[in-house]
């Protein structure tokens, strides 16, 4: 984590920054998160997290929704969601709403 990156917690409400979007790359057969002058390959789990970042629900709510949907421990999912979102924050691909 860099000094410039805000701390992400379960109460954080975030959405993708302007100009950042998911893109299917048919040539490589993978999904990438595109931002101005940079890209990040993402797997199916990351795609699900990115799609859930609606700027309305906090990360704890998103994790609880995933835990219910996938019948998995909420604590484990919450940690994975926060870690991935922190990485997006460091890469300046997010906007913190609250």
From Swiss-Prot:
Gene3D superfamilies: Coenzyme PQQ synthesis protein D (PqqD). Keywords: Plasmid, PQQ biosynthesis. One of its GO terms (molecular function) is quinone binding. Pathway: Cofactor biosynthesis; pyrroloquinoline quinone biosynthesis. GO terms for biological process: pyrroloquinoline quinone biosynthetic process. NCBIfam families: PQQ_PqqD (TIGR03859). Monomer. Interacts with PqqE. Functions as a PqqA binding protein and presents PqqA to PqqE, in the pyrroloquinoline quinone (PQQ) biosynthetic pathway. Belongs to the PqqD family. This is PqqA binding protein. It comes from Rhizobium meliloti (strain 1021). The lineage of its organism: Bacteria, Pseudomonadati, Pseudomonadota, Alphaproteobacteria, Hyphomicrobiales. The gene is pqqD.
């Amino acid at each position: 984590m860099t000094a410039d990156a805000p701390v992400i917690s379960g109460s954080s409400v975030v959405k993708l920054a302007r100009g950042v979007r998911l893109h299917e790359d048919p040539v490589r057969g993978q999904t990438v998160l595109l931002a101005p002058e940079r890209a990040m390959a993402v797997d199916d789990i990351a795609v699900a997290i990115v799609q859930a970042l609606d700027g309305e629900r906090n990360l704890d709510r998103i994790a609880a929704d995933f835990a219910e949907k996938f019948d998995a421990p909420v604590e484990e999912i919450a940690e994975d969601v926060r870690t991935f979102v922190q990485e997006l924050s460091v890469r300046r691909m997010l906007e913190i709403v609250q």
